Amino acid sequence: MIINDKKDQETKVDDTTTLTLTREHLLNCQFSAWYKLYKSITPKTRIIKPLPEDFVNYLSEDGVILPDEEKTSYGSDSGVFEEYSDDEDELDSYVSKLDDFHPKVQAVIDEFGAVAPKLNWSSPQDAIWISPSNSTRCVTVNDVYLLLKSSDYIAHDLTMLDKLGGIPKDFSFELVLRKWININPALEFRCFVKDRELIAVTQRDQNYYEFLIKLKERFLGEIELFFYEHIKDTFPDSSFVFDVYIPEPYDKVWLMDFNVFYPTTDSLIEWSTLVNLDATSPSFDLDLLLIDKELRNASFACQRHSQNKVPMDIVNASMDTEAMVEMLRSQQREMDRLDGDQGGEASATGDTTGDSVANETTAANTTSQDS
């Protein structure tokens, strides 16, 4: 990838095609840029904008410190959750300056009952392993902060514009709080638009669902109609990606998000194939790509974002019982070896070993249940 700090990013996707990502493309895809236009077809959402500079700094700093529960009266979590860092005092100082911001978040939670947070572009899906609900569902202010602080996706949002010429003067970070919906991942679809033509639709979740086969043509027809009625001529870019959700009874399409038409956007179809699809060609036939049954136990058969949640050995082991057992045995052998090296301290170390193995098991189970 070629990174031009003054303007754009470019990626060569095949021998003849280069895609360009501009700052304007990114800005057009941030939530507040499009939500008002599509509000009637998007789940209920509240946007807190602009975010206080102290809150942005709080998200940017390493470590996790949450507001004192007794001070905020938000939720039943312990008052402070910490991961020690050299900048802990500075991080704590940011938290202490957010007393006026906490009630704004709480007000939206009170309105909706539960919320799913995101920043301008990204949702902290990679951090749900740390959530008690194993999802992005938040019922307290601390739930929201913990997810945002634990997410690599959110950290990326905070620096994304720096690689494209910097942050515009009129730009501000925003906290998006969507009313919580218990989404069935099988019913989420990603739609690719090139030159204002819908060129491909794919399943978003990387697992096989047999029931989707019978519904494929119905979903494709509904998505195509939705595109022509609401999206085709209204989004500012001519090429882009949008996500939809079609819950039971499958009679309404909900717009969930917009993404750039660029390889940084995940796709089940190779980008070298996507850029060569031509909806104006007489031979073109729009298709909805579903995960094939044969791929169910292959590389696609995993939960989205699992690589971001816990170490890869745990992710891999969670998909294979024998691998899980072997991983835990290996850890036990290593701990036993360390016990032997420490001599008289072996007994104390042995107590810790049990906790360590139990924690690894819990982490693996969390990964395997990702939604």
UniProtKB/Swiss-Prot annotation:
Domain of life assignment: Eukaryota
Compartments it resides in: Cytoplasm
UniProt entry tagged with the keyword Cell cycle: yes
Pfam families referenced in this protein's UniProt entry, alphabetically: D123
Keywords: Cell cycle, Cell division, Cytoplasm
Annotated Polar residues bias: 349-371
A GO cellular-component term linked to this record: cytoplasm
GO molecular function, one term: protein folding chaperone
Region (Disordered): 334-371
GO biological process: cell division; eukaryotic translation initiation factor 2 complex assembly
Family membership: Belongs to the CDC123 family.
Annotated function: Regulates the cell cycle in a nutrient dependent manner.
Protein's name in the database: Cell division cycle protein 123
Organism: Yarrowia lipolytica (strain CLIB 122 / E 150)
